[in-house]
């Protein structure tokens, strides 16, 4: 777990502000990604900490009430240690919470409905600003990235389909994504649900 930040280090933003930040950092992120022979990515995480507890490793953070925060001035090209061997040219978005989560039980501080919607709205806003298609190749959970499900093979797999070292957001504990099922193809995996919601917000903004 990374360094905890005080609330005073964070700035609450709207989706419009997040979209503008994405546009402002579109080229720097694209250049950084190109140097690694890949496209700009959005990686979706949970912090494995508590609601209201901010961390230094994530560009965008979403609290239990769905409020969206950035660190300081929101520098999206800051290199944070969020996603192993994938941090250059990427933006990390994290839900605050999920301390003690297991593949059987998401614990006392699971993703809230407001957080899930906030995450989808944040992903849609950033994808708009960065000119990204919302698909698994560009917008994916840490668990999906850990198993190289986007086809970018920069490390050995360590996600929910293999070692389960990282499985962030593989399931959400909701009716849409009720259980840990990393091989599911019915749209119930957490990443599929979040991308679907992000697409909806993109179309209805």
Q: Residue spans of the language-model regions?
A:
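Basic/polar, cationic surfaces and motifs that engage anionic cell-wall
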Residues: 1-36, 100-205
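N-terminal catalytic cores of peptidoglycan-degrading enzymes
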Residues: 1-87, 156, 199
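Structural preference for beta-strand elements that scaffold enzyme active sites
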Residues: 41, 90-92, 138
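A mature extracytoplasmic/lumenal domain signature
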Residues: 48, 74, 97-99, 143-145
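Weak global preference for isoleucine
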Residues: 62, 68-71, 93, 116, ...
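Short C-terminal domain-edge/linker segments immediately following a structured domain
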Residues: 72-77, 91-92, 124-129
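Short coil-to-beta-strand
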Residues: 85-97
């Amino acid at each position: 777990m990374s360094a905890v930040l005080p609330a005073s280090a964070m700035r609450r933003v709207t989706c419009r502000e997040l979209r503008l930040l994405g546009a402002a950092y579109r080229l720097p992120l694209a250049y950084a990604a190109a140097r690694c022979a890949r496209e700009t990515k959005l990686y979706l995480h949970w912090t494995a900490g508590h609601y209201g507890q901010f961390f230094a490793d994530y560009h965008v953070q979403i609290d239990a009430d769905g409020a969206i925060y950035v660190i300081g001035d929101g520098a999206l090209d800051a290199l944070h240690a969020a996603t192993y061997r994938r941090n250059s040219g990427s933006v990390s978005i994290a839900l605050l919470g999920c301390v003690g989560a297991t593949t059987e039980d998401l614990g006392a501080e699971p993703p809230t409905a407001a957080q899930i919607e906030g995450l989808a709205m944040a992903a849609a806003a950033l994808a708009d600003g960065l000119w990204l298609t919302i698909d698994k190749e560009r917008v994916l959970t840490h668990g999906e990235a850990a198993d190289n499900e986007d086809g970018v093979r920069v490390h050995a797999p360590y996600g929910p389909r293999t070692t389960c070292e990282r499985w962030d957001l593989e399931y959400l504990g909701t009716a849409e994504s009720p259980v840990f099922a990393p091989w599911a193809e019915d749209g119930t995996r957490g990443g599929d649900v979040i991308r679907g919601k992000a697409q909806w917000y993109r179309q209805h903004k």
